[in-house]
């Protein structure tokens, strides 16, 4: 499969192990694309690693910031604008997203518009979990408890809930 990883802000942190998994098992995957966005260049996580990954021949790294500062020469705009700019086959891609809810919602929709099916898009519903056993209800997302049932879900399992604000 091709692999597309899309992170927004601190959402890159939980995706980092997946990035290293793909890099350490490159022979098991075809095209590998990382799409990452942050508010500003100063808020980019793992800047040194982003630079190293971007220099690799076996992956594509596309980075965007919402607001450019002096000296920034990269892309400006929301990370979802990067969808479609990397080499991957929408019919064969597995996609992993983590970031703010709105980014995941619009990111998934952009990927769907490119032909990726909802059962191949995985979202990491990182929530502030307290008890980790589903007792307190703090991480309840509709009928789902993120701590017990996730935090990673196929998009087709949560797409209706992710559309609702404040769920």
Regions found by a protein language model. Name each.
Residues 1-130:
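FNR/FR-type flavoprotein reductase catalytic core
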């Amino acid at each position: 499969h091709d692999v597309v990883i899309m992170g927004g802000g601190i959402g890159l942190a939980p995706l980092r192990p997946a990035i290293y998994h793909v890099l350490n098992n490159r022979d098991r995957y075809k095209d590998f694309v990382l799409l990452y966005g942050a508010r500003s260049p100063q808020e980019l996580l793992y800047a040194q690693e982003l630079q190293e990954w971007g220099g690799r021949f076996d992956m594509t790294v596309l980075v965007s910031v919402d607001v450019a500062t002096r000296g920034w020469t990269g892309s400006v705009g929301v990370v979802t604008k990067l969808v479609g700019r990397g080499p991957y086959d929408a019919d064969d891609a597995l996609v992993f997203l983590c970031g703010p809810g709105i980014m995941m919602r619009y990111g998934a929709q952009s990927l769907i518009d490119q032909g990726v099916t909802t059962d191949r898009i995985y979202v990491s519903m990182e929530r502030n979990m307290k008890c980790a056993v589903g007792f307190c209800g703090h991480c309840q997302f509709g009928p789902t408890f993120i701590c017990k049932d996730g935090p990673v879900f196929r998009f087709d399992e949560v797409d209706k809930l992710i559309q609702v604000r404040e769920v």
